[in-house]
A protein has these predicted regions:
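C-terminal capping/lid region of NAD(P)-dependent oxidoreductase domains
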Residues: 200, 230, 240, 294, ...
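Glycine-rich cofactor phosphate-binding loops and adjacent beta1-alpha1 units
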Residues: 181-263
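C-terminal substrate-binding/catalytic core of Rossmann-like NAD(P)-dependent dehydrogenases/reductases
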Residues: 191-195, 247-307
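Glycine-rich beta-strand-centered segment in the early N-terminal region that forms part
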Residues: 20-36, 47-90
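A structural motif shared across PLP-dependent enzymes of the aminotransferase-like
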Residues: 87-99
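Mid-domain Rossmann-like dinucleotide-binding core that forms the NAD(H)/NADP(H) cofactor-binding site
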Residues: 113-188, 192-193
């Protein structure tokens, strides 16, 4: 079977491997689609490893879908023949995953669309952590795949959603999701519709997904009293000096947003895998995944609108290189391993 690895900065190589056997608690999946992470996969491609350049090949693991071929002892949630969405899968023809990494697909939801289900699932966690309440106004800063997934889930949960994206191409793609509004800060005529959408009440919750310090500044600048900023993006580099001073002034200059406006800044990982006492919350990643797939199967969560490109597996390196070179048209990229 083919299995693609990152073998150095901006190098991808396919290896031929034996199809693995599932052990106890594991599931063998015949992969149908894999999807790119615009954050971690691109970071590993650029640097050659998760912690910088590595002497060993690195898997570009993220999300996908496929059909269960076999299960190990003790597996009860899925059976051979089940269609599943998965998280933590590499770009490979077959994958052995733990039972907790696969989630059964119901109804007519296709494998292509289900391959992207992980990011909307993570968005459920972000909305939980951001203390979202129904009918609130949610601003999503950055409309790459993470931001689009978050905006789509917030919209599905009943939020008034305003998408903010500085890139014209991505803003136009985002308008296809039919959110409350999508605006491009800095473009002619954008200020008035943003102010009109937010009204006097302003933003209740801002999901900062860009991973850019400029995006974080945008989020802080849009906050009002008691606004919650839930940070989904990862800031891999230090902010430029001038921008760091601007942020310090916004957050801590008198009257500081952080103190006087009671701004909340929340880091967003995922909900726990299992309910752990004494935490009274029942939200888990498994329940969130089941919810996402259920709503998508019901036609209430159009995951297909997140797909911008369907590619062949051997296009992996060229797609990553185009993304690394700044091509912003690649948003939701999936690789087709098996025809549906």
């Amino acid at each position: 079977m083919r299995h693609y690895y990152i073998t150095g900065p901006e190098r991808v190589q396919a290896f031929e491997e034996t199809v693995p056997e599932p052990g106890p608690g594991q599931v063998l999946v015949r992969v149908a689609f894999t999807a790119l992470s615009p954050g971690s996969n691109l970071h590993v491609f650029r640097t050659g490893g998760y912690g910088g350049s590595s002497s060993q090949p690195e898997e570009a693991v993220y999300m996908g879908s496929g059909v269960v071929e076999a299960v190990g002892d003790g597996v009860t949630r899925v059976a051979p023949g089940d269609r599943v969405a998965s998280v933590g899968v590499g770009h490979q023809e077959y994958a052995v995953l733990s039972e907790g990494q696969v989630h059964r697909i119901h109804g007519e939801l296709g494998l292509r669309d289900a391959s992207l289900a992980y990011l909307p699932t993570w968005s459920v966690s972000a909305l939980h952590l951001g203390q979202y309440a129904a009918a609130e106004t949610v601003v999503v800063v950055g409309l790459g795949l993470v931001g689009l997934s978050a905006a789509l889930m917030a919209d599905q949960m009943g939020a008034r959603v305003l998408g903010i994206e500085v890139d014209a191409q991505r803003a136009e793609f985002a308008r296809g999701l039919r959110l409350g509004a999508v605006e491009q800060p800095g473009a002619d005529g954008a200020t008035e519709p943003i102010a009109e959408f937010l009204g006097d009440a302003g933003a209740d919750l801002i999901l900062e997904t860009s991973g850019s310090w400029h995006g974080f500044k945008q989020a802080v600048g849009m906050a009002r009293d008691w606004t919650r900023i839930a940070v989904m993006g990862i800031y891999r580099d230090l902010p430029p000096g001038d921008l760091a001073l601007e942020l310090h002034g916004l957050l801590y200059g008198f009257p500081s947003k952080f103190h006087y406006q009671r701004l909340q800044i929340i880091g967003c990982g995922s909900d726990p895998a299992d309910v752990v006492a004494p935490n009274p919350r029942l939200a888990t990643t498994h329940r969130n995944f089941a919810y996402t797939l259920e709503r998508a199967a019901q036609g209430k969560l159009p995951l297909g609108k997140l797909v911008s490109h369907v590619m062949r597996p051997d296009d992996l390196e060229s797609v990553l290189r185009r993304m690394a070179d700044g091509d912003r048209s690649y948003v939701g990229v999936v690789f087709e391993w098996q025809a549906e």
